[in-house]
């Protein structure tokens, strides 16, 4: 996409340096006029969150005050950093001197509540021990929902699909097996994308006769689909990030399976982060005239610091009676049932049905898109609304920052009641339980189950003081310890995603 194309939008917003400074204008993707029986909803999207939830919510409030509207949903595209207490910091793949508590712990403890429904995927800098409790997603705090390793859920009847983590070839074919305590390697592999997750997401594609629809409204990933710069102004991108060109040309920039996901699922919007630059692209789909699906509008956003383009507002049309709440997607639930045997919890390479291998797959079936009969079975589950009252604190909340609260051992791994309830309800394997049962070591009693005396007991002491230094950016996207990037994003405008 050339930056010379005309657009009707403003540049994406940066943060604010002080409480009295207005944010820069945000990009606003505006759909066609609302028809009878429709209403508009507004979704705020941010790139890497880096634990800066206070600043992100404050920026949203300023935008709302300036423009006279309210956001209905916030989407965060990874590096969310859901750190509950200082014990979670060793579970983050960040050098110890850069580990910082940030502000999520306030929302986990109940000191603050997210002012808007918040949805996020995982990146490569996460409190992985906590997220591993929720492989299929769940509430990490009141009003804040994690999508799990891969998921498709609905909001206002919009279908939102998400893929957590970043690509690494060495771990791509393995099942998910990591949980605390993490080895030095496992704390990195825990956030690596798995082929089984992408295989499940590809089953969201439409039936073979449907060539014109966009089955997914919004798709999220942390790193970029490999090859996406070819669909945008890549010359501009390579001027801004001079090391990206070599990675792109060698096929190392982003997830090499990402474009297949775009072509299979044809999302209307694809939102990403990770590379700390705002970049737009437009991916066309096959067809002509009225028989052609909408193109996929790709947008990656920056990190939340002053002057950087880290937030975008989407205006989307939905049905007048659409409920502004999260619900499970029937097709995704059926896919989880259909592919249940691919959940193993052990460190093994998975042979998927669409792979050529000398080893047999556990399934003879090749196509796991749900049949009409399988979807009827999902209907028997009843109401698919995601309950908002199922959150429970598994690790102790941090209620006061003291020296003793900093000097604690790494957090244990916990049985999460949300995972137990979801898997029992759907009738699928419970990866959280499988990981708990691997060994009794480093398995803790969930905080919500403890008596007050237990909760007030002094924890085992550790000599590590993690400190509160600001987080430094991740320095790459395809290796365990990537090299530093040389160039930085300046304040030029980028081309915004056009509307129809």
Swiss-Prot record:
Record's compositionally biased regions (Basic and acidic residues): 472-500
UniProt-listed GO biological process terms: mRNA splicing, via spliceosome; RNA splicing, via transesterification reactions
The enzyme's E.C. designation: 3.1.4.-
Top-level lineage group: Eukaryota
Cofactor(s) named in the record: Fe(2+); Zn(2+); Mn(2+)
Cofactor: how and how many bound: Binds 2 divalent metal cations per subunit.
Keyword annotations of the record: Hydrolase, Iron, Manganese, Metal-binding, mRNA processing, Nucleus, Zinc
Coiled coil start-end: none
Signal sequence coordinates: none
Function: Cleaves the 2'-5' phosphodiester linkage at the branch point of lariat intron pre-mRNAs after splicing and converts them into linear molecules that are subsequently degraded. It thereby facilitates ribonucleotide turnover.
Protein name per UniProt: Lariat debranching enzyme
Organism (species): Caenorhabditis elegans
């Amino acid at each position: 996409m050339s930056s010379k194309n005309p657009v009707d939008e403003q540049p994406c917003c940066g943060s604010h340096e002080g409480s009295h400074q207005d944010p820069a204008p945000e990009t606003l993707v505006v759909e066609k006029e609302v028809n009878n029986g429709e209403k508009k909803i507004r979704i705020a999207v941010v790139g890497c969150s880096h634990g800066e939830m206070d600043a992100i919510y404050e920026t949203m409030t300023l935008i709302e005050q300036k423009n006279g509207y309210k956001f209905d949903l916030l989407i965060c595209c990874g590096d969310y950093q859901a750190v509950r207490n200082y014990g979670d910091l060793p579970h983050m793949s960040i050098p110890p001197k850069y580990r910082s508590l940030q502000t999520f712990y306030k929302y986990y403890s109940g000191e603050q509540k997210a002012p808007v429904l918040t949805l996020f995927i995982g990146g490569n800098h996460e409190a992985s021990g906590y997220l591993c409790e929720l492989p299929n997603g769940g509430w990490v705090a009141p009003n804040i929902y994690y999508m799990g390793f891969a998921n498709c859920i609905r909001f206002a009847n919009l279908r939102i699909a998400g893929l957590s983590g970043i690509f690494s070839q060495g771990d791509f074919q393995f099942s998910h097996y990591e949980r605390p305590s993490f080895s030095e390697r496992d704390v990195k592999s825990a956030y690596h994308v798995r082929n089984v997750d992408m295989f499940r997401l590809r089953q969201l594609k439409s039936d073979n006769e449907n060539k014109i629809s966009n089955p997914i409204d919004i798709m999220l990933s942390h790193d970029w689909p490999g090859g996406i710069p070819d669909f945008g102004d890549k010359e501009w991108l390579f001027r801004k990030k001079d090391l990206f060109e070599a990675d792109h040309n060698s096929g190392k920039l982003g997830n090499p399976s990402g474009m297949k996901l775009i072509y299979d699922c044809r999302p209307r919007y694809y939102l990403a982060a990770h590379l700390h630059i705002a970049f737009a692209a437009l991916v066309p789909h096959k067809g002509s005239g009225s028989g052609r699906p909408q193109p996929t509008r790709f947008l990656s956003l920056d990190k939340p610091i002053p002057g950087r383009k880290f937030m975008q507002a989407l205006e989307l049309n939905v049905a007048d009676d659409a409920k502004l709440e999260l619900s499970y997607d029937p097709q995704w639930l059926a896919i989880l049932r259909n592919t249940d045997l691919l959940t193993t919890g052990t460190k093994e390479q998975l042979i998927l049905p669409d792979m050529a291998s000398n080893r047999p797959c556990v399934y003879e079936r090749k196509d796991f898109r749900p049949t009409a009969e399988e979807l009827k079975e999902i209907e028997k589950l009843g109401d698919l609304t995601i309950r908002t009252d199922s959150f429970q604190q598994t690790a102790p909340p941090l209620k006061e920052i003291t020296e003793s609260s900093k000097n604690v051992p790494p957090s244990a791994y916990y049985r999460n009641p949300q995972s137990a309830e979801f898997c029992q309800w759907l009738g699928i394997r419970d990866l959280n339980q499988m990981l708990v049962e691997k060994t009794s070591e480093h398995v803790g009693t969930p905080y919500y189950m403890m008596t007050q005396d237990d909760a007030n007991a002094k924890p085992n002491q550790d000599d590590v003081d993690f400190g509160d230094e600001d987080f430094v950016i991740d320095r790459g996207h395809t290796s365990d310890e990537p090299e530093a990037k040389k160039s930085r994003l300046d304040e030029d405008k980028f081309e915004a995603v056009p509307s129809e």
